[in-house]
């Protein structure tokens, strides 16, 4: 018996030593491989490791949290790290969280770490292999194909549409002078109309599905957030069995049905044109995005599914992210009457009729541009950008194992006091040329950066600038919502639980 007990003790001891040794390389209770340093120094000397609430790493930290709780959890992790990047240990893969511009630069500039992280897989059924998610040759080919669709001359041709939609928006405000308006209800219609009529070439007002599409986008994000709040829901089989899969399928049918209708309508128009011809100067004509895709299809460079993926990507990117930016910018202007008045004075140098304002004149609105940039800094539409290591990679002195997740926290990078003193204050003048000297080139990245930056960023800024100019010239904005009353939520884009309200008063001319 004593021999058996001794044998058992030795076996348990050997097993314990084995597990202890393995635990140096693998976080056994989290079922993931550990991040280590390239020079063999202690991990804590280069990065903060966020302690989990249980022995199972951070796996149970997010379980059944709300989107607002997740937003708070991220901010708390950033605060605990105290200016350092930090590590979470999740099921099967650690997550490297970057909050420093200097370290984000290496990821942004990398041509190897371009695959999106796991959270984007929850969006793939919606967007497919569009520019946001696609990688390697498919991404390179489509990026090259679509870049001319956002050339200066194309943007200039969109200007008249932005102006026309802005006039329609002003008419809505004229009918509601003195009332508190929920920006979340009126801004999305404006931005969706713009993206459809410009990049896609289809008037949304002619299509009754517009409201249904907007609601479907809202419902999709609710399901997305539910899956983000339960790690098991990341697995499609689990979501199919225990999630609201039927509702999810109906939402996707609505979204894809709407975008397919736009493509079909544009395809009919396309057949009546001779796209791809040369102009009177012998140069190949440039076309808006959907025309460009249809021309590429005619040349065998993209198939129908590829067109659908890109249209879904651009509709979402050009509609939802721009809506978010406009909503926050209008609120910030309402909260800061002095900044609003400075922009109003700047606009007095423009022709009274907005139709006569040129692209050059819009580009010369320095104070308004500073306001837009400061709003994007405080409230970036996409607060996090994600990547996945498809192989073991060395980054910023760390060895990241295969499948490690990388999150670049745009929200926190742009609130780094080293680059933006008084980071939580709204100070548009910080973006004046004389105040931007020597700022780190990756400290302000609301549109991402590097080769995979947002292809439509100039489109979005011009759209925002045209509407803001029209609104400020015609109305005084008064706040009906305070920033401290808002509860922020983590999601596909930055959200608040509350609708944001602003009161518009007609200016005396």
Swiss-Prot record:
Which coarse location class applies to the principal site listed for this UniProt protein? endoplasmic reticulum
Its EC number(s): 1.14.-.-
Cofactor(s) required, per the database record: heme
Q: How does it sit in the membrane?
A: Peripheral membrane protein
Pfam short name (any one): p450
Domain of life of the organism encoding this protein: Eukaryota
GO terms, molecular function: heme binding; iron ion binding; monooxygenase activity; oxidoreductase activity, acting on paired donors, with incorporation or reduction of molecular oxygen
- What functional role does this protein have? May be involved in the metabolism of insect hormones and in the breakdown of synthetic insecticides.
Its recorded name reads Probable cytochrome P450 4ac3
Q: Which organism is it from?
A: Drosophila melanogaster (Fruit fly)
Q: Which gene encodes it?
A: Cyp4ac3
